[in-house]
């Protein structure tokens, strides 16, 4: 759990990753969290099976999800999360280091998931593949290693990190009283409602009162890593986010790039940040049926 008012260093460079592996390899697990948008022809699991950081396990957000919910990769129940990560050899005290092949795209979603369920020792390793190769280190190929299953105890959903549709409605109905910023991580044209959504049955536009900070404004070119903290501060400040005590809810298409903003905001010391789990995949359907929920244009 994030400590209130305390800056958490959870983004690791290659040297930090290697040090953790050196200090406590038996209690450190690398997780490949590679995932691509449905419109992409690539497959994260297939790429993992072809090559990976040595010893890495694969975290599939389309497997570790709420299977009773038709929306994409919604958070799983706590007991199912515990069962899933236990099979990956992860217990409550494991150092979990998460990366994705793109660099800093889907790994923050898995980072946020671990935080939601109260895992303390979880880190992000941006630009992992390039950093690994630059150090002259080899990737692992062939059959992935099979971890020894363990029991993950004490998983409990932290509601302070998750926003629901009801939370969104409260902000829409009384933004000043709610005192919450809703930040949309989608591309600007989607936010404006100028282009159709790729998923069927979704309205085009945005949540009333929300502001748009495309997640790519917070990442380096190619979405390989987060921008330096100083640059992130400038991005958020330019959009009016200067008071780090004001609550923020991040949203996107299905909760993935909203988690990129979550990580960037936490890196800058924002204290109260939640991810709207269903994001536009759920909200857009509701807005299709109730136009009062929809805003378009700037």
Swiss-Prot record:
The modification Phosphoserine is found at residue 164. Required for formation of the 2-thio group of the 5-methoxycarbonylmethyl-2-thiouridine modified base in some tRNAs. Substrate binds at residue 190. InterPro entries: Rhodanese-like_dom, Rhodanese-like_dom_sf, TST/MPST-like. Pfam families: Rhodanese. It is found in: Mitochondrion. Its main location: mitochondrion. This is Probable 3-mercaptopyruvate sulfurtransferase. Residues 24-141, 176-292 form the Rhodanese domain. Contains two rhodanese domains with different primary structures but with near identical secondary structure conformations suggesting a common evolutionary origin. Only the C-terminal rhodanese domain contains the catalytic cysteine residue. Residues 142-175 are annotated as: Hinge. SUPFAM superfamilies: Rhodanese/Cell cycle control phosphatase (SSF52821). Its EC number is 2.8.1.2. GO terms for molecular function: 3-mercaptopyruvate sulfurtransferase activity; thiosulfate-cyanide sulfurtransferase activity. It catalyses: 2-oxo-3-sulfanylpropanoate + [thioredoxin]-dithiol = [thioredoxin]-disulfide + hydrogen sulfide + pyruvate + H(+). One of its GO terms (cellular component) is mitochondrion. It is an enzyme of class 2 (transferase). The active site is at residue 252. It comes from the Eukaryota. One of its GO terms (biological process) is mitochondrial tRNA wobble position uridine thiolation. Keywords: Mitochondrion, Phosphoprotein, Repeat, Transferase.
């Amino acid at each position: 759990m994030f400590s209130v008012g305390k800056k958490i260093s959870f983004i690791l460079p290659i040297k930090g990753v290697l040090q953790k592996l050196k200090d406590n390899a038996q209690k450190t697990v690398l997780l490949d969290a590679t995932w691509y948008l449905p419109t992409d022809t690539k497959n994260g699991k297939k790429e993992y099976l072809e090559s990976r950081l040595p010893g890495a396990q694969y975290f599939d957000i389309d497997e570790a999800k709420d299977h009773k919910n038709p929306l994409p990769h919604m958070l799983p129940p706590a007991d199912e999360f515990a069962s899933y990560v236990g099979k990956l050899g992860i217990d409550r005290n494991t150092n979990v280091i998460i990366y994705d092949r793109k660099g800093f795209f889907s790994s923050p979603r898995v980072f946020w998931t671990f935080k939601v369920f109260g895992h303390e020792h979880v880190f992000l390793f941006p630009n992992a593949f390039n950093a690994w190769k630059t150090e002259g280190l080899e990737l692992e190929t062939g059959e992935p290693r099979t971890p020894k299953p363990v029991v993950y105890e004490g998983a409990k959903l932290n509601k302070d990190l998750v926003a629901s549709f009801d939370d969104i409605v409260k902000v829409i109905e009384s933004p000043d009283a709610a005192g919450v910023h809703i930040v949309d991580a989608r591309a600007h044209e989607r936010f404006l409602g100028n282009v159709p959504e790729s998923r069927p049955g979704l309205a085009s536009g945005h949540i009333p009162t929300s502001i748009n900070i495309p997640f790519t404004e917070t990442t380096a070119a190619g979405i390989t890593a987060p921008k330096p903290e100083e640059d992130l501060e400038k991005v958020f400040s330019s959009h009016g986010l200067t008071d780090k005590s004001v609550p923020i809810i991040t949203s996107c298409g299905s909760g993935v790039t909203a988690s990129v903003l979550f990580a960037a905001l936490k890196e800058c010391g924002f204290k109260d940040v939640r991810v709207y789990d269903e994001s536009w995949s759920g909200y857009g359907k509701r807005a299709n049926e109730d136009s009062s929920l929809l805003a378009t244009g700037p």
